[in-house]
Amino acid sequence: MSEAQGKLLQGEMNMTLNMTIMTSARDAVGKCLATLGGEYDNMLVLTADVDTSSRIQAFKEKYPDRCYNVGIAEQNLMSVSAGLAHEGFRPLAFAFAPFASMRCYEQVRTDICYSKLPVVIIGNGAGYSNGASGCTHCALEDSALMVACNNMTVLEPGDPFQIAKLLEA
């Protein structure tokens, strides 16, 4: 990353992330969502009771009518997101990575992928990063499962700059 990129991440929307201070991937997502919400009136954020860990507070404060917590019900999260996408909304569905892939795999495959619906699924805490929560919260096979779905694109950004660019797209 160049020095200019290291200090500031600036997208076409004037989205700025200060990279001189350590910015986590989750914080980058939260900041980007708050900015993108002003550009896309049909953007909705749905969570499976991971509002705080997903850092969506800024979006939730700016657009409380476009943020929904379905509770610890990942299967429901995916089916609701599919229904909203079918009606013209652009849902972003947040859950812990192992639950965004394994717990609701049938709903993702059947409701979202078969219908080619534009649902963005964001699984946070991939790999061993949620290890303190126990082995059930470690996602080691999530990417392998999701790439097996037809009409699914799996992206794994490596840093906050890549996250911002992916969300802008």
Regions found by a protein language model. Give the residues of each.
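Thiamine diphosphate
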Residues: 2-169
